[in-house]
Amino acid sequence: MSYRHLEQYVHGLPAEGSFSIWAGPVEGPAWVTFRDREPHYAASTMKLALVIAAYRSAEAGTLDLDDTVAVHNCFASAAGGAPFSLDPGEDSDPEPWARQGQRVALRWLAYRSIVRSSNLATNLLLDAVGTSAVMAAVHAVGATDSVVARGIEDAEAREAGLQNLVTARDLALTLRALVTGTAAGRDSCEEIVSVLAAQQINDAIPAGLPPGTRVAHKSGWVEGISHDAAIVFPDDAPPFVVVVCTTSTLDESTGLGLIAAGARAAWSDRPQS
């Protein structure tokens, strides 16, 4: 089968910068890949592995997702230095900030870290789960090139060389494992996919798809970086996975448009029933 639109998309990628794509079915060989094992700073895509780890830990009995923790803004650095705090102005979700001093469920933190990409919810959840459990979840799906070593805005850890890294291939492996029910227990995987489908920040992959298409995805962005990783559920074809990672000097709007174009190409090349 020809994947003409995806191949044209890859050939048209900018010469400067780092661009990666993985597109293909939930099971079986990829349709098209391009630099899919090239590492990128993960940005908020690391929250996908964190949430999977939280559900796996609940299944193992090491935490209860319905347990509550106090909402605060003081975190220990992964580098072992002075505590740090998050900048609320850099967070896309005001809800956890409005609950400072209150207790909230870990399940709610997992939800907010996906649907609004909350940085505060992410670090609170990471405190409960731990980076070792996150890495176990990463390795369980065969994502051998990714690293989650620290929380969000942990500048001291970043300066010490502790980075969160991801590849398009690893994100695709993770999403495929969610659909097949192997990233965690089947019920947990189904719940996580439902949370991903509830994401409210839809300016990358969903923007390249027909309106109303069900998309379960996690995006990530900081200056110079835009990623999105999605399970797409067409009405006329089996679900498929598309991941686009970009590290470049492109402005935010152009970077998002590039990701949307990749999604559009994958949609055009989907094998229809």
Q: Which positions does each model-derived feature cover?
A:
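Structured C-terminal helix/loop/strand segments within mature extracytoplasmic catalytic/sensor domains
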Residues: 2-16, 30-31, 173-203, 219-273
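Short, conserved catalytic-motif segment at the N-terminal edge
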Residues: 15-39
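Mid-domain, small-residue-enriched loop/turn segments at the edges of structured enzyme/sensor domains
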Residues: 16-20, 102, 122-175, 179
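Active-site SXXK
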Residues: 29, 41-69, 242
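A short glycine/serine-rich beta->alpha loop
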Residues: 33-41, 106, 110-111, 158-160, ...
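Short glycine/serine- and small hydrophobic-enriched flexible loop segments
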Residues: 52-60, 127, 173-180, 268
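Acidic helix-start/capping segments at beta-turn-to-alpha-helix junctions
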Residues: 65-82, 129
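Conserved catalytic neighborhood of penicillin-recognizing serine enzymes
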Residues: 77-123
